[in-house]
A protein has these predicted regions:
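C-terminal regulatory/oligomerization modules of transcriptional regulators
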Residues: 1-6, 119, 123-140
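N-terminal leader segment of winged-helix/HTH proteins
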Residues: 1-32, 136
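Membrane-interacting alpha-helical segments
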Residues: 7, 63-64, 93-95
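Short, locally clustered residues in the helix-turn-helix/winged-helix DNA-binding domain
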Residues: 15, 43-47, 107, 134
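Alpha-helical linker/hinge and terminal dimerization helices associated
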Residues: 17, 21-24, 60, 102, ...
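N-terminal helix-turn-helix DNA-binding core of bacterial DNA-binding proteins
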Residues: 19, 23-66
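DNA-binding alpha-helical recognition surfaces that contact promoter or target DNA
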Residues: 69
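Charged, amphipathic alpha-helical coiled-coil/dimerization segments
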Residues: 72-131
Length: 140
């Protein structure tokens, strides 16, 4: 665990908190050989059934170039495949049967981290945190 930082800067505090929370998920998912980012990509694509790289990037909120780097590793693991369209612009991604099997194993693990965070915060604070995070996403 990191030493908590106390700063008046919202951005710094959010980054530190996000890093700590990401570490919790990454440590739990490491047993399955994936990171939280990879899990997020796989589960979002699975929920979409099929998507282009651009559609998936928009859904997850990642820069397309960042997503492409992550996809290369996930595709090499056999969890996502590229389904070619008529031309390269029509290529779509989809989760493979191995990827769906991985999700069956990892969703309960992901949920256990969710539960741990909610328990640590208390249900009222957990709900408040989600409201605040949603509002922060709407800001521009």
């Amino acid at each position: 665990m990191r030493n908590p930082v106390n700063s008046p800067c919202y951005c710094l505090m959010l980054r530190r908190a996000a890093s700590s929370v990401t570490d919790m998920y990454d440590k739990t998912l490491a047993e399955y050989g994936i990171t939280l980012n990879q899990f997020s990509i796989i589960i979002n694509l699975n929920n979409m059934s099929m998507a282009t790289t651009t559609e998936l990037a928009q859904q997850i909120g990642l820069e397309r170039s960042t997503l492409v780097r992550n996809l290369k590793a996930i595709m090499a693991m056999g969890y996502i495949e590229n389904v070619s369209g008529e031309n390269e612009r029509n290529n779509h991604l989809k989760v493979t049967s191995s990827g769906r099997h991985l999700l069956k194993l990892t969703i309960p693990v992901w949920q256990s981290v969710q539960d741990k965070i909610a328990e640590s915060l208390g249900s009222e604070n957990a709900a408040l945190l989600m409201d605040i995070l949603y509002k922060l996403q709407e800001m521009e």
